[in-house]
Every structure is written in C-alpha cells, then in structure tokens.
Amino acid sequence: MTENTESPQSVATDIPEHKRRIKSFVLRQGRLSQAQQNAIDTMWPQYGLTLEDKLLDFNTLFGREAPTIIEIGFGMGNSLAAMAEAHPENNYIGIEVHRPGVGALLKLVAEKGLTNVRVFNEDAIEVLNRQIPKNSLSAVYLFFPDPWHKTKHKKRRILQAEFAEKIAQYLAPGGQFHMATDWEDYALHMMSVMSAAKGYRNISGEGQYTPRPDYRPLTKFEQRGHRLGHGVWDLVFERI
C-alpha cells in the first residue's frame, strides 16, 4: 500500500464510539476505470459482500468446507488473486475500502475464473466485529499497510495492541497472522506489538522475522526494491 500524505481528519467526541475510532485510512475518492466499473457491475452480485449484522457461514458462502483466509487492505488485488489462483483449496475474503481496488480485484477474478474469492468494500474492523465468527479463520494477511511514518500519525497505524488481540479472537487455534512491510520502523513496531500480544507465538522464534513464505507473491514493487537494496520484513505469528 502506498504512503498516504493526506492529513488525518479530526476525531469528534459527540458521535458513537465506532465512528470516533481512529481509522488507519483516509478514504480517497479515486476514479474507477471503465474496466473496473464494468467488473463491479458484472461481478459484484456474485462475489461482493454487503456489511450486515449477521455472522457469515463460510461453508454456505463458498459452497464447500475449506480453510478461510482474510486479507485486510488488498490494494489492487494482485497478490490476493494470485494466491487464490495458486491455492484453490483455500477460501479467500478480501477487505478493501478503496473502490478502484475492489474493481481491479473483481476484474482479475473474472479473468482468472476464480470461484474462491469474496470481497468487502468496507472498513475491516467493522467486518470483523459484525460478520466474522470467532475462532474461524485459518489466516489473516496484512500486507504493506499504510506506514503512517510521521510521528504525529503513528497512532493511526492499523497494527496496535488492541488490533493484534482482536485478530487472535478470530483465528482458529494454529491459525496464522502474517504481516509484511517495507518500512523498517513499522517492522520494528509490528515486532514489538506482536511480541507483547497475548495468545500468539512467533513461528520463527522470539524477535525473529520470517523469510517471505512461498505463498506470498513477490510484488513488482518488491522486486524493484530488492534491486535497489531496500528491505522487506515479514512477520508470522501463530495463535496458540
């Protein structure tokens, strides 16, 4: 996810708590391409999910019993589509607030003929709170979230202690929370938060980062970064 340089909105105190929560994103009104709009028009009825106050039944949703994985903030959907294509044995639910990314993913779903992907165009916290059963997920992926690198904005980083403990509630025992970032300061923050969070173990050992697992696609951005000597840090913590 690219760096966000917009100023965060002020937080009001006279509105409900779920609306006062400091959000990790600023909703930008990006323009959809015609192809993205067409994909939403044609694919959303089958693959799109609308936020409700009702827990999902994954077996009914996907028409089968299979491990279910959520990716939070899938960007333009390239990695999620690649994983779903490479691992048809898994179910994938993508959550993204930016509509062009939703359109881009649905376009890939159509092109690849994927049937194991469903999509929310919503705030991930709201989806978790209202629709995901506890102890149900095989994995949660958080790849390249906004680093909010300015000191005054770091409180907006999605990975905080409360969020880490929330994710643990939705993972099945043995389920994994996999994070990746290309900002070293955020990698250190992630390691600090996750090492202190209850209910997890670092699969690579205390304080250790994990080599990129084969299932996480190497992005074009990463490939360019590697050529320039830039680092990428993966962390994988298992619910115990």
Curated annotation (Swiss-Prot):
<comment type="function">
    <text>Catalyzes the formation of N(7)-methylguanine at position 46 (m7G46) in tRNA.</text>
</comment>
<dbReference type="InterPro" id="IPR029063">
    <property type="entry name" value="SAM-dependent_MTases_sf"/>
</dbReference>
<feature type="binding site">
    <location>
        <begin position="219"/>
        <end position="222"/>
    </location>
    <ligand>
        <name>substrate</name>
    </ligand>
</feature>
<comment type="similarity">
    <text>Belongs to the class I-like SAM-binding methyltransferase superfamily. TrmB family.</text>
</comment>
<dbReference type="Pfam" id="PF02390">
    <property type="entry name" value="Methyltransf_4"/>
</dbReference>
<dbReference type="InterPro" id="IPR055361">
    <property type="entry name" value="tRNA_methyltr_TrmB_bact"/>
</dbReference>
<keyword id="KW-0949">S-adenosyl-L-methionine</keyword>
<feature type="active site">
    <location>
        <position position="146"/>
    </location>
</feature>
<keyword id="KW-0808">Transferase</keyword>
<dbReference type="GO" id="GO:0043527">
    <property type="term" value="C:tRNA methyltransferase complex"/>
</dbReference>
<feature type="binding site">
    <location>
        <position position="150"/>
    </location>
    <ligand>
        <name>substrate</name>
    </ligand>
</feature>
<feature type="binding site">
    <location>
        <position position="146"/>
    </location>
    <ligand>
        <name>S-adenosyl-L-methionine</name>
    </ligand>
</feature>
<keyword id="KW-0819">tRNA processing</keyword>
<dbReference type="InterPro" id="IPR003358">
    <property type="entry name" value="tRNA_(Gua-N-7)_MeTrfase_Trmb"/>
</dbReference>
<feature type="binding site">
    <location>
        <position position="96"/>
    </location>
    <ligand>
        <name>S-adenosyl-L-methionine</name>
    </ligand>
</feature>
<feature type="binding site">
    <location>
        <position position="123"/>
    </location>
    <ligand>
        <name>S-adenosyl-L-methionine</name>
    </ligand>
</feature>
<keyword id="KW-0489">Methyltransferase</keyword>
<comment type="pathway">
    <text>tRNA modification; N(7)-methylguanine-tRNA biosynthesis.</text>
</comment>
<dbReference type="GO" id="GO:0008176">
    <property type="term" value="F:tRNA (guanine(46)-N7)-methyltransferase activity"/>
</dbReference>
<protein>
    <recommendedName>
        <fullName>tRNA (guanine-N(7)-)-methyltransferase</fullName>
        <ecNumber>2.1.1.33</ecNumber>
    </recommendedName>
</protein>
<feature type="binding site">
    <location>
        <position position="71"/>
    </location>
    <ligand>
        <name>S-adenosyl-L-methionine</name>
    </ligand>
</feature>
<feature type="binding site">
    <location>
        <position position="182"/>
    </location>
    <ligand>
        <name>substrate</name>
    </ligand>
</feature>
